[in-house]
Amino acid sequence: MDLDLTPGQEDFRAEARAWLAGHVPRTPLASPETEEGFAEHRAWERTLHADRWSAVAWPAAYGGRGRSFLEWLVFEEEYWAAGAPARVSQNGIGLLAPTLLEHGTQEQRARILPATASGETVWAQAWSEPEAGSDLASLRSVAVRTAGGWLLSGQKTWSSRAAFADRAFGLFRSHASAGRPHEGLTYAMFGLDAEGVRVRPVGRLDGRPAFAEIFLDEVFVPDRDVVGTPGDGWRVAMSTAGSERGLTLRSPGRYVAAARRLVALWRVAADPGDTALRDRVADAVVRARAYQLYGYACAADGPRGAEPSLTKLFWSELDLALHETALDLLGPYGELAGPAGDAPAHGGWAEGFVFALAGPVYAGTNEIQRDIVAERLLGLPKGRRA
């Protein structure tokens, strides 16, 4: 397989690099987990959208550039290499949008995607519940049929971006008589300011609300905000889960850029005689490059069923390895949340490490992903379930 980019793709890379060089904020934005920082990040989304860089692989009619998936990977490489801000639009652009493009109606795409691309609508993900995490099919929140739509009731937790987002998408049990837990589910979108919705932010160790609980009490959702066929929500949700676990939410460019930062840190902070740390840095660089080439191969060959599970295993463990190595290079300075005195450039490694610890858990635990890879990619028999 030829993994080299064409001259046209290299021209696109140069165009993206030039635009980012002229527009990426020189001063880091405040944390998106604060009200001020969220507003700054939403403004950045508008800047991206103004020149159609917010969703380059979307059709032009929805605010994109009509570029290929491979070119999106190239843009992501340049985006993270430029030190651009985190994307508060990631749930909408990276998760909901691919789902709507596959399962949504033309009306839904025309109504929702342009507002998502522009940052006008920022989305939260409402999957997990107090008793339904990786075992999502055991969810208890319900959708009850009513005239012209559905009434949603229940509780969602660990809802990313919900503290400041505008809307959310989630899964609800609409047909209680269905035999299997994966059946009888409906995929619905709802406003976080709708009557009957209460959002309770969940603070991190630093007190910032990275997540929130969402309580729903007979929240009306019109039929036009149901994605796919009512009762067939599990199939729709698996499209979203594939995006979350795969390349879309955690593109290789993010880790290639992190590996470069790790090398820069090693050059200023490493003990020249510590060959073990040197080898760990080299290993992280090689793994990031392998992930990059894997992304190119996926773009060329298309999806292969359970490959998002394989991808999720790779990026979550790579992310953790990058940050663990950085903290070991920093030594005592690794405890710092920001720059201080004569400390080597910290690069946000401490905060990133805390987030990376959750990587093997969210988007479906890595244990579950290994089961999926074993059964669907390797053809092994199903393991025993406790």
Indicate where each model-derived feature is located.
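Glycine-rich beta->alpha junctions and the first turn(s) of the following alpha-helix
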Residues: 7, 197-291, 359
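A short, Trp-centered hydrophobic/proline-enriched beta-strand micro-motif
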Residues: 119-127, 170-171
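Amphipathic, small/basic residue-rich leader segments at the start of a protein or domain
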Residues: 1-88, 111, 115, 249, ...
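C-terminal helix-coil-helix/basic helical segment that borders enzyme active sites and/or dimer interfaces
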Residues: 28-35, 271, 275-278, 289-342
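Internal helix-loop-helix
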Residues: 49-110, 114-119, 161-167, 288, ...
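A structural signal for short hydrophobic beta-strand segments in well-ordered beta-sheet cores
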Residues: 141-144
